[in-house]
Structures are given as C-alpha cells and as structure tokens.
Amino acid sequence: MAAAANSGSSLPLFDCPTWAGKPPPGLHLDVVKGDKLIEKLIIDEKKYYLFGRNPDLCDFTIDHQSCSRVHAALVYHKHLKRVFLIDLNSTHGTFLGHIRLEPHKPQQIPIDSTVSFGASTRAYTLREKPQTLPSAVKGDEKMGGEDDELKGLLGLPEEETELDNLTEFNTAHNKRISTLTIEEGNLDIQRPKRKRKNSRVTFSEDDEIINPEDVDPSVGRFRNMVQTAVVPVKKKRVEGPGSLVLEESGSRRMQNFAFSGGLYGGLPPTHSEAGSQPHGIHGTALIGGLPMPYPNLAPDVDLTPVVPSAVNMNPAPNPAVYNPEAVNEPKKKKYAKEAWPGKKPTPSLLI
C-alpha cells in the first residue's frame, strides 16, 4: 500500500512492511498537552497509522505548522509484538523522548514511552488496554476488612488515576464504535436518486370546465343549495255554497280573535247589571249609551293587521226596562275564581 506525499517536491511512498500486523485490542495513545489529558487515540484496528497535517491522507491529523503533510508512521510488528515508529523524512523531525529519529528507519517504541512530532507541544504516550481486574492486596491486615469493598468495586481499579484512565479509554472506545457504525451504515445504505418525471411544463389542448354555470346558462349558480320537496295537495271541494261557508268561517275566526271577552268576559252578569248593562255581542256592553268592548288585559300578539271596527256615534235608543231599585243598590264586583292547575273538583267536606 502506498501513502501520500510528504513536504517538498519529492513524493516518497510509504510501503507497508511485510512484518506489519494487527495490534492487540486496547492499544492506544494518550495525547497530553502540559499536564492535561486531551484525548485517547485507539490504534488497534489497522497494521499502521499515519500522522501529519493532511487530513485526507493521514489517520491522525497534527494541526501544527512545524509538522509535514505526512510526518511519520506507526507500525505494529506481528512477530516481535512491538510497536515501531518510522519518520517519513519530515522537515522538523520525529522525537522519541528527546531523541530525534533517523528518516525511514524503524524505531521500537516501548510501552509508556512518549513521542512528539516537530515543534508541537503535544506528547503521545503509548498505552496498553487498562486492567479492569483489581490489583492484588498486599499484607494480611488488608485481606479481612477490604475484601467486601473490593467486591463492591465490581472490577474497577482502586486508585483514582487508574479509574480516570479507564473512563477515558471507554469514552474513546465508544466514540470510535459510534463513528464506525455511522460510516458502515452510510456505505451500506445508498440513497436512491430522485427521478424527476415531470420536469417540464406542458399545456393540455382540452379545456377543462371547472364552473359549468359560467358556460351553460341553464345551469344555476346556486344549484347545490336548492332543495326539492314534494307536498301532497288535498282535493278541493266542488264549488258551491259549502266552499264559501268554509272560507267565511275561517275569516270570522281571525276577525273575532282580537275582540275576545277579556278577563271578565266569561262571568255571568249580576242581578243589578242584568237590566242596566246588558252584554252585547262578542263581549260588548252598553256603557253610557254607547256599545264599547271590554278591554283585554292580556291580549295575544297577532302579526296580521287588524282593522278596527267603526263605532256608531248615534246609536239607536236601547229599549231597556228602567229599574229604580238597581240604581239605589251599591254595585258589587265579581271576581273569577282562580283555578289551580291539576286540581280536581272535590265535593264540600261540610255536611
């Protein structure tokens, strides 16, 4: 396999050596700047990893001006079970601790050793997979009381530094898994290209009528709002005096509706009022020699206009019998008995 070009006009190719193999799981680099741990780089998936400024050609990008585009290569030896670092003719060099490496010469990197690239202040420390089992307890005094505590730790390291190291490693491992899952999913799932069938504007020659009432005058504009109902009509009676009687009786009922007897229209006349004020037709009485209708205290509302009846100003003299006893007796009013709704007439309880 070939790598990309380095700085300068020459284009050296990195050929993967035949002794390169896949590293053991959990092998990683701790990236430290000063006293702060920045990140962990997992290096257990490939035979070799490239470092440099070119993000398209390198596995790990070094964002520093002193580094070359393809600066160095980290290779795992499958027979020696060791990691080797190769400088790819960089301008400012690759360092193992404070020792600068010779170009194109593999150099073994022991575990827990630190390397750096160019003038970058970031240090890369080679680490193995953190041990999840607790370290052996030294001394017979700690065996009794701390066994329960060690069981409660569930395989976590005792020291806080080791615990932080394990946490960072798990975080980097999970981040790599999520990245690989997304990349593999993008490779497997190919989005189908969207086909544009009707990308051009076409005009139809046929005219489509949306509102037929604008074209056809026989079609009504409000045809959807019209409802049709069939009402059967009774047969009319034969023309004759009988038909006139029905019409006259209906008109008389409408005319006599307004001239009801009123509140006291249904009361029988008293003995004193029988002779002096006889009732006329349709609730009228002679008051002061003039026929006047009783006032209706609760008239019904009728929407049809009622023609008022003409009052005769010169009535004919009423041949009523004059009774002098009725004049001297005091007049008494009679009130209608109130009828309770739902009350049934019961015989008097008094015997």
From Swiss-Prot:
- What are its GO biological-process terms? mRNA processing; RNA splicing
The places in or outside the cell where this protein is found are: Nucleus; Nucleus speckle
Residues where Phosphoserine occurs? S178, S199, S204, S249
What interactions and quaternary structure are annotated? Interacts with phosphorylated CDC5L, SF3B1 and MELK. Interacts with EED. Part of a complex consisting of PPP1R8, EED, HDAC2 and PP-1. Part of the spliceosome. Interacts with PPP1CA, PPP1CB and PPP1CC.
Q: Where is this region: Interaction with CDC5L, SF3B1 and MELK?
A: 1-142
PANTHER family under this entry? NUCLEAR INHIBITOR OF PROTEIN PHOSPHATASE-1
Against InterPro entries, the record matches this protein to: Cell_Proc_Reg/RNA_Proc (IPR050923), FHA_dom (IPR000253), SMAD_FHA_dom_sf (IPR008984)
Write down which residues bear the modification named Phosphotyrosine. Y264, Y335
Q: Where is this region: RNA-binding?
A: 330-351
- Region Involved in PP-1 inhibition: start-end pairs: 191-200, 331-337
Domain comment quoted from the record:
Has a basic N- and C-terminal and an acidic central domain.
Give the matching PROSITE patterns: FHA_DOMAIN
The protein's PTM annotation reads: The N-terminus is blocked. Inactivated by phosphorylation on Ser-199 or Ser-204.
- Motif position, Nuclear localization signal 2: 210-240
Q: What does this protein do?
A: Inhibitor subunit of the major nuclear protein phosphatase-1 (PP-1). It has RNA-binding activity but does not cleave RNA and may target PP-1 to RNA-associated substrates. May also be involved in pre-mRNA splicing. Binds DNA and might act as a transcriptional repressor. Seems to be required for cell proliferation.
Molecular functions per Gene Ontology: DNA binding; mRNA binding; protein serine/threonine phosphatase inhibitor activity
Per the annotation, the residue ranges of the short sequence motif Nuclear localization signal 1 are 185-209
Q: Where is this site: Not phosphorylated?
A: T202, T346
Native species: Bos taurus
Q: What is the lineage of its organism?
A: Eukaryota, Metazoa, Chordata, Craniata, Vertebrata
Q: Which residues carry this modification: Phosphothreonine?
A: T161
**Residue ranges of the region described as Involved in PP-1 binding:** 200-203
Q: Where is this region: Disordered?
A: 316-351
Pfam families from the UniProt entry: FHA
> Record's Gene Ontology CC terms?
nuclear speck; spliceosomal complex
Name of this protein: Nuclear inhibitor of protein phosphatase 1
